[in-house]
Amino acid sequence: MKLNTKYHGCIEYEEKDVIYFQKGIPGFEELNKFIIFPVEDNEVFLVFHSIENEDIGIIVTSPFNIENNYEIQLEEEQITNLKLQDEKDALVLNTVTLDSDIDKITVNLRAPIIINIKEKIGEQIIINSDKYKVKHSLFKEEA
């Protein structure tokens, strides 16, 4: 199958690559099917893209690229919804807000996207803690 994206050209994918989000994601609740693919010539960023709306693609990264000790505690309901049997099956990604000024690029560490890579289902959760910021600076040390 092919997806003609607004910013990343034509992307080929297979049905097995599609990740289903029952509730969508905040701001895009009507979109339930996404794929993930690498940003060209970049090992840190990925594109989290809707296959239902070719204009909706979000840059994401692993939180472990930013915070070595990043930890989240999923609630039982979230574990059940995601059908997680083993934490090794969980892929954790965080959204990136880009800016032409590199010092203003931020990562949302408070609302990770959790994906069960075996079952191909996902959910974006909100961490109820001040430990992580919604706008964590990616390249500049926090004051």
Swiss-Prot record:
Gene3D superfamilies: BH3618-like (2.30.290.10)
One GO process term, biological-process aspect: regulation of translation
Keywords: Bacterial flagellum biogenesis, Chaperone, Cytoplasm, Translation regulation
UniProt subcellular location: Cytoplasm
Gene Ontology CC annotations of this record: cytoplasm
Chief place of localization: cytoplasm
A matching Pfam family: FliW
Similarity comment: Belongs to the FliW family.
Oligomer and partners: Interacts with translational regulator CsrA and flagellin(s).
Role played: Acts as an anti-CsrA protein, binds CsrA and prevents it from repressing translation of its target genes, one of which is flagellin. Binds to flagellin and participates in the assembly of the flagellum.
The name this protein goes by in its record: Flagellar assembly factor FliW
Species of the source: Clostridium botulinum (strain Hall / ATCC 3502 / NCTC 13319 / Type A)
